[in-house]
Amino acid sequence: MTNIKENYKSKVKTYQPKPPYVWNCVKAFLVGGLICAIGQGLQNFYIHFFDFNEKTAGNPTAATLILISALLTGFGIYDRIGQFAGAGSAVPVTGFANSMASAALEYKSEGLVLGVATNMFKLAGNVIVFGVVAAYIVGMIRFAFEKLMS
């Protein structure tokens, strides 16, 4: 039986199309770079027209990108961008907003508490947990280095 399974797997492998890894990386790089360029343009806009500095313009820039991402998710456009770009649209803050907005839209028929609030953090919760843990670890390493160097 094992020989038959191995033979089947080898035959399937010969006919299975190879994923275009290089092209997928190029698309992710270009779309992710475009999202970051839009973010930089928004930050420059806030600095120039609203008298922010580089440090204070970050929060309204992120909020604007999140709002745009949530709107594009609601209109079904961000899903098409994600299908084309893959990780290029999932890694920036817009991907996090997309995951929360799409879950909220999917479960809105079940009500605000049991539908939206319960299911909104299913995918995004992992990102939050690992982000907090990584920030804690990096903070402890930095604290240790500062104590050792002083």
UniProtKB/Swiss-Prot annotation:
- Give the species this sequence originates from: Bacillus subtilis (strain 168)
Its subcellular locations are: Cell membrane
Q: Which keywords label this protein?
A: Cell membrane, Membrane, Sporulation, Transmembrane, Transmembrane helix
| Single biological process term from Gene Ontology | sporulation resulting in formation of a cellular spore
The UniProt transmembrane annotation reads 30-50, 57-77, 84-104, 121-141
Show the InterPro entries listed in the entry: Spore_V_AC, SpoVA
Q: How does it sit in the membrane?
A: Multi-pass membrane protein
GO CC terms, sorted: plasma membrane
Official protein name in the record: Stage V sporulation protein AC
Source species, domain of life: Bacteria
